[in-house]
């Protein structure tokens, strides 16, 4: 009589593996496939994944704007060197190029314009899973628009694309569009915005609310709040004279970050944060000085409370920097990533913190009949 491994032990072992390993387990038997698609296992796997977060880099390669997706373990201490062997990489195959304008939400990336020669010579909106390298070509709205954003509703587990029609100004007098990414026909629906504004590209989705920077009709900088589930807009005044350099998730709240560079003395950075406590109230934090001689961007705040800055352009070596604003720390913890900056044709980088493997995201892409990328 054969000794079998208890199913509870199998679940425990597989829940600590990778999404790729789970996918292989689906092929073992129908029973295993059913077990690993249960809600209980998907939530258990996500809990385990959150204990090993990664940093996701979206790297623009060459003058034709080809894209690579790289992720690496999110360092938990200073002076750490991340070897190239720890980097997971997916890349669009040769000839695929896209706009620099893209948005990220809950593990997926939405490109407003992407050209995939084997599919179509024209540029199309594309949804991509950087973990698996799969993508979905989305239908195009029948109207012109400069700005569109990806959001995620954590209650109904749905991704939606918000498309603001017309040119640089989103008028309250025209129809805008929204696309829900679910099984079946992908179809744009009209939606109205109660106020006229000029959208900007600084954006983030936090707990089912999509936030993006904008200017109102008076020329003041504002934040547009879009409830992804209920599809409602709200306007929040930033009381700032310039746009935020980045929007980050500050313990579940929106935080606008401003970086001030003193160019004459070698790029020391002054960082200022403004936290939105609710839609009616916000407050400024104190200045934090960061002594770094680099041209940096803000990736976000980790679950441990560290703000992550990264080098805007690829170099060799490539560094990310950590500091904790609550301690008002003046010392930057630097992490060297070997291999990321080795390609001289890489133009620009974007980064996202606390990137975790989520099986529900993989299922969403499967339901949309996603297509695998070719990996270089």
From Swiss-Prot:
The family database entries (Pfam families) matched by this protein are listed as: F-box, FBA_3
What InterPro entries does this protein map onto? F-box-assoc_dom_typ3, F-box-assoc_interact_dom, F-box-like_dom_sf, F-box_dom
The segment(s) forming the F-box domain are 1-44
Q: Which domain of life is it from?
A: Eukaryota
Q: Which SUPFAM superfamilies match?
A: F-box domain
The UniProt entry, under NCBIfam families, shows: F_box_assoc_1
| Name of the protein described by the UniProt record | Putative F-box protein At1g30930
Q: Which organism is it from?
A: Arabidopsis thaliana (Mouse-ear cress)
């Amino acid at each position: 009589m054969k000794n079998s491994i208890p199913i509870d032990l199998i679940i425990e072992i597989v829940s600590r593996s990778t999404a790729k390993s789970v996918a292989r387990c689906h092929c073992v038997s129908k029973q295993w496939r059913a077990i690993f698609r249960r809600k209980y296992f998907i939530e258990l796997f996500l809990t385990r994944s959150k204990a090993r977060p990664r940093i996701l880099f979206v790297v623009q390669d060459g003058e034709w704007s080809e894209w690579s997706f790289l992720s690496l373990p999110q360092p938990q201490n200073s002076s750490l060197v991340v070897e190239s062997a720890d980097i997971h990489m997916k890349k669009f195959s040769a000839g695929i190029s896209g706009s620099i304008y893209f948005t990220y939400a809950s593990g997926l990336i939405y490109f407003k314009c992407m050209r995939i020669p084997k599919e179509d010579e024209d540029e199309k909106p594309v949804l991509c899973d950087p973990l698996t390298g799969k993508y979905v070509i989305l239908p195009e709205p029948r109207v012109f628009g400069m700005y569109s954003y990806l959001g995620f509703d954590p209650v109904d587990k749905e991704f939606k694309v918000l498309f603001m029609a017309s040119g640089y100004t989103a008028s309250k007098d025209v129809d805008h569009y929204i696309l829900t990414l679910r099984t079946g026909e992908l179809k744009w629906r009209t939606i109205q915005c109660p106020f006229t504004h000029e959208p900007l590209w600084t954006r983030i989705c936090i707990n089912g609310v999509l936030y993006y920077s904008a200017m109102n009709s008076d020329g003041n900088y504002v934040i547009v709040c879009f409830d992804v589930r209920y599809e409602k807009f709200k306007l929040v005044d930033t009381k700032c004279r310039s746009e935020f350099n980045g929007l980050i998730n500050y313990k579940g709240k929106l935080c606008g970050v401003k970086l001030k560079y003193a160019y004459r003395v070698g790029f020391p950075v002054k960082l200022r944060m403004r936290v939105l406590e609710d839609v009616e109230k916000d407050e400024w934090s104190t200045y934090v000085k960061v002594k770094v001689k680099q041209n940096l961007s803000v990736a976000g705040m980790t679950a441990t409370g560290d703000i992550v800055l990264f080098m805007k352009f690829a170099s060799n070596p490539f560094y990310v920097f950590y500091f904790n604003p609550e301690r008002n720390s003046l010392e930057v913890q630097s992490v060297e990533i070997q291999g990321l900056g080795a390609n001289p044709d890489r133009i620009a980088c974007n980064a996202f913190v606390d990137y975790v493997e989520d099986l529900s995201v993989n299922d969403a892409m499967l339901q949309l009949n996603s297509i695998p990328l070719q990996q270089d």
